[in-house]
Amino acid sequence: MQPATQLQFTNHLSPNGQCILQPPPTPSLPDKMEKAPPQPQHEGLKSEEHLPQQPAAAKTVSRHIPRLRAVVESQAFKNILVDEMDMMHARAATLIQANWRGYRLRQKLISQMTAAKAIQEAWRRFNKRHILHSSKLLVKKVRAEDGNIPYHAPQQVRFQHPEENCLLSPPVMVNKETQFPSYDNLVLCRPQSSPLLKPPAAQGTPEPCVQAPHAAGVRGVAFLPHQTVTIRFPCPVSLDAKCQSCLLTRTIRSTCLVHIEGDSVKTKRVTARTNKAGVPETPLSRRYDKAVMGPSRAQTQGPVEAETPKAPFQICPGPVITKTLLQTYPVVSMTLPQTYSASTTTTTPHKTSPVPKITITKTPVQMYPGPTVMTKTAPHTCPMPTMTKIQVHSTASRTGTPRQTCRATITAKHQPQVSLLASIMKSPPQVCPGPAMAKTPPQTHPVATPAKSPLQTCLAATTSNTSSQMSPVGLTKPSRQTRLAAMITKTPAQLRSVATILKTLCLASPTVANVKAPPQVAVRGSIHDNPPKAKATMNMKQAAEAVKASSPSCLAEGKIRCLAQSRLGTGAPRAPAKLPLEAEKIKTGPQKPVKADMALKTSVAVEVAGAPSWTKVAEEGDKPSHLYVPVDVAVTLPRGQPAAPLTNASSQRHPPCLSQRPLATPLTKASSQGHLPIELTKTPSLAHLVTCLSKMHSQAHLATGAMKVQSQVPLATCLTKTQSRGQPIITKRLIPAHQAADLSSNTHSQVLLTGSKVSNQACQHLSGLSAPPWAKPEDRWTQPKPHGHVPGKTTQGGPCPAACEVQGTLVPLMAPTGHSTCHVESWGDSGATRAQPSMPSQVVPCQEDTGPVDAGVASGQSWKRVWEPARGAASWETRRNKAVVHPRQSGEPMVSMQAAEEIRILAVTTIQAGVRGYLVRRRIRVWHRRATVIQATWRGYRMRRNLAHLCRATTIIQAAWRGYSTRRDQARHRQMLHPVTWVELGGGARVMSDRSWVQDGRARTVSDHRCFQSCQAKPCSVCHSLSSRIGSPPSVVMLVGSSPRTCHTCGRTQPTRVVQGMGRGAGGPGAVSRASAYQRAVPSPRQPRRRDKAATAIQSAWRGFKIRQQMRQQQMAAKMVQATWRGHHTRSCLKSTEALLGPADPWSSSQHMHWASSQHTHWPGI
């Protein structure tokens, strides 16, 4: 608004004392008045000199006053004021709208930001929960890996070294249902400080060795302190659940030893403690003793031709086992006072017939005079034991009896006695005599057959920890001491003192009825030309006593120990090698005699991948248990047929080591025609019972004579024909035992009959899966022959056309049909490939063979197997590519049950991950939709609320504006309507016009006319012209046309009105009086102008007052509106978070100037 011109009037006194208002000169006026000097208002009498000038000044002022008043009171000036007010209101409305739009925008942004923050917070909470859930899963996984030992019976409590927890990673438990071994559950035996462990220098060997000489009742392999050799056995068995895995540092294999693969194996510290006999024993041996001493039943007598798989294979740091010195110990009749130079059996009566021990290490290994496959080794031959042809009567129950009951029994828990190569040492293999030495017919080949010397395994001690007296002739009831020992072993509290108890019990009853085995049962072995033949007969009870006598220390807790065996020449004891594997606990029952004619005509050369760790012992102590261990089946040539020596039978460095060795001589008597009635023993299997790795890992190879190790060609898949007694036998692959475990999970421990009838019945229910219809019964239990092997020679040839690389074949150690020869191939690297080809003539182990299966433990282990693929298992594509095909349709092997289970687990994991991802994505989508709905609802609510506030504010503003406009219009209307009042005539007189007269002394409006120039101060010229003269009232009535006219000042269009004039009335006294009265009332134009001036001043003052009053009202209304808006805006800003976004009143500065200018605006009081 433009600042209004402040008119200041000064009062000038005229000479007559009249106050004259004189405004100061205003340059902005259009008429540009001259400047007049201001004079004091109350000026006294002046001198006479100045008197003439004052009237002139007064005259000049009076001449300019009308024009100033006319300008101030002109309609143009008023229009300017109105325009300024309109502009002010327009600006105010614009500011209000802009502020409202900004407020709306800020509210929208705030709502969006709030919604975004809510969404982000929700997402953060979800992500946190997801991370916490993942961490919980990881913790659960770690806990599952740490505590993956399922519930074990009290007798299965494991005592571990405190340093076991510091190993690399937890073992992968094996599913008991599948009976499939894991890939990293072997133990790296770290040598403990023991008086029996001696450095190689003490042994007189230039190179370090991993194998310690075997002594009666001693099992295990000890790593010398200077050796750090990580090994992996072909058939690893789950040891303690706390066993850790480590990477192999060297890959060592030898023909005599089982495959040593460069892969992850389990390491475990085995602490040796001295038992009561003063001989250090390892916890493994103690556990072995406990497991073996469980239900010890005297088994029927029979020749033993398969080494017990309890002895771990010996490991040499070098790939080729050289310098294996053959040390023969003369075997004397089995008597209790017999002493073994390297016997580790504590509290075992010394026996006079030492057993030849072989040490398959780079140190000068003392090897028993069995044909060994050691090449590049100048065998040291110790005096060969006199025992070559021995008829081993079945000794006491193999379970509770240590190896010391007889030389044959002694070899049960440790590795097979392997004689060195005949080509190297020309010494025939020696069979350790059984407790009852029966002279076998001289069907022994001389050791001249360089590599074809028969196994040096005491077949009487075949099944380690098992009462596996082969082909028992008669069932003998186990002694009470044996049963008592079995009961004692079930007590966890006596795990550590069981050795002493067993010793005391076993030494109590020395006499037992003498039992002799028929000549068919006699064990036949190739005899050296020099050593004499020794026969030792011993009754079953004495054998049992001998077993018990030696077992307290050896079998106390099923641990395997290898005591240093001093050679006969030097007498230096060898350091006992601690078995890295945990001995399996087995219970044996009396085995029924097996018909010799039904037995297969093949001798068993058992090569065991490793001793499995049994996690559960059979519930009933008296129930027999079947022991199944992966074994290498080697077909022995018919007697009298020499086998070609294998010179480069050194260890191949390929992980799957295939022992291709024809057995040099059948280990059975000529009358038995190679039938080896194997005593069937059943061992409670937890996860790898079917794959129970016996301790006679590599010695079976040595005992089998010269054998060739081919690492890359699976022996089981090569169908070769061997002639045993002139009959070709097609070697077959036995079906993986873990498949049988699935089918026989609910079986109980039963005694398997070794007869052909029993074997046919036992495996009849599995014939549909194991052996196809075209498979012949005799083919099911035939022994696979090495690749390229012919009866007369041994070749190093590659795989047969049908051969395919298979890893992890599991076969039972003892077949129901007698001694089912089988071959165990090396397991794959880290379990990467576990598919096992099922050849057309595979035989599935019977339900009785696989042993009892704990469903709860199996399920728990199978659940824990879910995490196994993450620790080195093959990828999904690798397993998926192994399609299950029919053996006749494709040469590829059938996928094993374990691989199929892993594939299923991976599939289930993938499906679960997909489902979880889908559920999470769907949940997030639902959250987004719900957030959108919430945001939309909130925005709608805010919009409606703001709209309601806006409507209320608008209503208030509009009401205020309408009131203001109405009041302004009314004021303007009142100002434009100035009624003309006539002077009241005398009483009773009436002014007669057409219809209106002033009667009863009342004055009435004569005319409502308002001229077009009514806005001006001076009267209308028309009205003035029509006004009545003195004595003559108006008599002319002006009739206006119908066309409207618009005022040039107010801009209103109004119709023309009739100006009522005073008509000439009738003559008479009334008229005269009326005219005189009118004449008095109407001022005369000749009156002095003084009155006119006074009236003008009064009117102008009144009008100024009215205008100022209206202005004050308008200002008050504007202030009210502005205050209302400011309060509303401030409250809105305080309610929101936008109070700090900017100034709440952006137009405060201009408003302040406006109010300042308006407050100082006032009208002159004239």
UniProtKB/Swiss-Prot annotation:
What is any Pfam family matched here?
IQ
In the UniProt record, the signal sequence range is none
GO BP annotations, alphabetical order:
spermatid development
Q: Which cysteines are joined by disulfide bonds?
A: none
Gene3D superfamilies linked: 1.20.5.190
* Renumbered residue ranges of the record's region Disordered: 1-56, 431-450, 769-797, 829-848, 1145-1166
UniProt biased composition (Polar residues): 1-19, 1147-1166
InterPro entries documented for this protein: CellDiv_DevSignal_Domain (IPR052318), IQ_motif_EF-hand-BS (IPR000048), P-loop_NTPase (IPR027417)
Highest taxon of the source?
A: Eukaryota
**Cross-referenced CDD domains:** IQCD
Keywords for this entry?
Answer: Developmental protein, Repeat
Q: Which residues form the IQ domain?
A: 89-118, 907-932, 928-955, 952-979, 1091-1119, 1114-1143
Keyword Isomerase in the entry? The reply is no
**Quaternary assembly:** Interacts with calmodulin.
What does this chain do? Answer: Essential for spermiogenesis and fertilization. May be required for manchette assembly in elongating spermatids.
Query: Under what name is this protein listed?
Result: IQ domain-containing protein N
